Structures are given as structure tokens and as C-alpha cells.
């Protein structure tokens, strides 16, 4: 990643901070001198600390970068064209939070598999009413369980994120030099060839808005994004609703036939088609334009095989025990 890309990332973080004010309590420290002398044994850190007083804002480096030919821009334009085509193909789903899509896929995946296996197993007992009653009982309890699991998982992610932010804020107030070291380590991990002047210039630019130093470390050092508002509730409803919706599919055919064997056949036919298209569409949503037709077909077949094995095993063992 180039320094231009890194500065673009900082601009994004600035816009985010202005919009959300997520760590605005650090704003009052904007004039605090963050680049101080280092007592570290690391020669790299010593060089950065000693050169910080000589480098104002890396004007020469910035001018060189601005005057250099920007081949990245052309690549970005090509990437934008590909992105536009992908957006046109995905339609509505492109505007939905990827985490919501992920939760929906989790709910649908389990909902299409578990209730199908259960209803297939219960059908071996020969009682359609038992299949419907047992299927609905499992469907409701499963949706609640999946929803609670999604809620707790999202809550744990949110708690971890805010704990990391709090820790970095405390580190900033206790010893802001540690923040500079972390930013330096992140930059060197991105590109070990960054010069001392480039790193110091970047830190000096970033220190103008101190709360962004915390945001930068959290996002690029910890790999964490701020959870969306009401993330826990959205995750619970999406996963639980997806499970409920998916679980209704194998159950519906039993409402329209009197013979449980016929209902099982119809349910299998419906589920083969549904599982295949679910695997196909899931791959298209998750991989976008990077997924080939053969890959999507393969994923669809795999979903059919997994669902079929689960349903077949349930039917066999219930029949064996019955």
C-alpha cells in the first residue's frame, strides 16, 4: 500500500469522525505534542524520535508524491468500472450491509438444513400431523435459539471493540509516545520500505486530530470496524428470521397432501431446487464478480448434498429406532 493510499485512509477516518463523533472526547487534546523523544532501544524508533524535530511536515516528500505519475488512478478507474458492473448485477443486495447478508446466509443455511432433516426423519413414522407439529416446534425453538446466538455474538464483538478503544484512549493519556510507536509499527507492517521521513510526516499529519490516531490503530492495527448502531438486535432478527423462513420451505408440502410419503417426495423435490439455488446465489453474493459459473454451480450442488445427507441420515435412524 502506498503513502497516498494511507493518506486517503486518513481522510476517510476524518470524515467518519466528523459524522459520528465516536471518539470526540479526545478532540480537546488536539494541540498536544504527540511526537516526543524515545527511550526505546530500537534504533529505528531512536532515528524517528531524533528526526522529528527536523522534519516539519515532509513537504518535499509530499510534493514528490503529488508530482509523480499516478498510475494508481488509472487502475482505480478500471476498478470502478468493474465495481459498477458488479453493483448492477447484485442490485438491491449491493446497498445492504455485508454483515446483514452474512447473518441472513447463516440463518437460511441452518433453516434449510435442520428442519428438512427433522421433517424427513419424522415422516418415516407415517403421521403427517406429527411431522407438521414436530416441525413447527423445532422451527420456533430453533429460530429463537439462533436469534439469541446472533445477539450474543454481536454483543461480544461490540464489547470487544469498545474495550480496545478504551484501552487505546488510556494509553494515549498515559503515554502518547506509545501511540506513535504503534502507528509506526502499522506503517512498517504495511510497507517495510517506508522511510523515516515518510513515517514522521504521516504521524505529524495524523496528530492534528488526535482521536483519529486511536481510530487508525483500531482499524488498521487491530483490524476492527466500529459496530453499526443496534447491531445486536439486527443480527438477532436477521439470523432468527432467516432460520424461520428457511425452515418453512420443507414443511409447506405436508399441508397440501394427506399421505405423508407423498409429502416427503414433494418436500425433497422442493428442497433440492431450493438448496441448489441457495448455494448458487450465496456464492454470487459472497464472492461477487470473482465467482465463476462453475464455482456457483459447485456450491449449489454441495448444498444439495449436505442437505440430502442430513435428511437421509435422520430418516434412516428414526426408521431404525421406530
From Swiss-Prot:
Segments crossing the lipid bilayer: 100-120, 130-150, 237-257, 260-280, 301-321
Disruption outcome: Deletion causes an increase in metal sensitivity at 15 mM manganese, but does not affect invertase glycosylation. Deletion shows increased sensitivity to external iron, which is suppressed by MRS3 or MRS4 overexpression requiring oxygen but not respiration, and exacerbated by ectopic expression of the iron transporter FET4. Deletion also results in decreased vacuolar iron content and decreased iron stores, which affect cytosolic iron levels and cell growth.
Lineage of the species this protein comes from: Eukaryota, Fungi, Dikarya, Ascomycota, Saccharomycotina
Region (Disordered): 19-86
Note: Present with 2840 molecules/cell in log phase SD medium.
Stated name of the protein: Protein CCC1
Keyword Membrane tagged: yes
Induction: Down-regulated under iron starvation by TIS11. Transcriptionally up-regulated by YAP5 in response to increased cytosolic iron.
GO terms of biological process kind: detoxification of iron ion; intracellular calcium ion homeostasis; intracellular iron ion homeostasis; intracellular manganese ion homeostasis; iron ion transport; manganese ion transport
UniProt cross-references to Pfam families, sorted A to Z: VIT1 (PF01988)
Subcellular location(s) of the protein: Golgi apparatus membrane; Vacuole membrane
Entry function: Has a role in both calcium and manganese homeostasis. Involved in the transfer of iron and Mn(2+) from the cytosol to the vacuole for storage of these metals.
Amino acid at each position: 500500500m502506498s503513502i497516498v493510499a494511507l493518506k486517503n485512509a486518513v481522510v476517510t477516518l476524518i470524515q467518519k469522525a466528523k459524522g459520528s463523533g465516536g471518539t470526540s472526547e479526545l478532540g480537546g487534546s488536539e494541540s498536544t505534542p504527540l511526537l516526543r523523544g524515545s527511550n526505546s532501544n530500537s534504533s529505528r524508533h531512536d532515528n524517528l524520535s531524533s528526526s522529528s524535530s527536523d522534519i516539519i511536515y515532509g513537504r518535499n516528500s509530499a510534493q514528490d508524491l503529488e508530482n509523480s505519475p499516478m498510475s494508481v488512478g488509472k487502475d482505480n478507474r478500471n476498478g470502478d468500472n468493474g465495481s459498477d458492473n458488479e453493483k448492477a448485477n447484485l442490485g438491491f443486495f449491493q446497498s445492504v450491509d455485508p454483515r446483514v447478508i452474512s447473518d441472513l446466509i447463516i440463518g437460511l443455511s441452518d433453516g434449510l438444513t435442520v428442519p428438512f432433516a427433522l421433517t424427513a426423519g419424522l415422516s418415516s413414522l407415517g403421521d403427517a400431523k406429527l411431522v407438521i407439529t414436530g416441525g413447527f416446534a423445532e422451527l420456533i425453538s430453533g429460530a429463537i435459539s439462533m436469534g439469541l446466538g446472533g445477539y450474543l455474538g454481536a454483543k461480544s464483538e461490540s464489547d470487544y471493540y469498545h474495550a480496545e478503544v478504551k484501552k487505546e484512549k488510556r494509553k494515549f493519556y498515559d503515554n502518547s509516545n506509545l501511540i506513535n510507536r504503534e502507528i509506526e509499527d502499522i506503517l512498517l507492517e504495511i510497507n517495510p520500505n517506508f522511510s523515516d521521513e515518510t513515517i514522521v510526516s504521516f504521524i505529524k499529519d495524523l496528530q492534528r486530530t488526535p482521536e483519529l490516531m486511536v481510530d487508525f490503530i483500531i482499524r488498521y492495527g487491530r483490524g476492527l470496524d466500529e459496530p453499526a448502531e443496534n447491531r445486536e438486535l439486527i443480527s438477532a432478527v436477521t439470523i432468527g428470521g432467516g432460520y424461520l423462513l428457511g425452515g418453512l420451505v420443507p414443511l409447506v408440502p405436508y399441508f397440501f397432501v394427506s399421505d405423508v410419503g407423498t409429502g416427503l417426495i414433494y418436500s425433497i423435490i422442493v428442497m433440492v431446487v431450493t438448496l441448489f439455488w441457495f448455494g448458487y446465489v450465496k456464492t454470487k453474493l459472497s464472492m461477487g464478480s470473482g465467482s465463476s459459473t462453475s464455482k456457483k454451480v459447485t456450491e449449489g450442488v454441495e448444498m444439495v448434498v449436505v442437505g440430502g445427507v442430513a435428511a437421509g441420515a435422520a430418516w434412516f435412524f428414526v426408521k431404525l429406532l421406530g
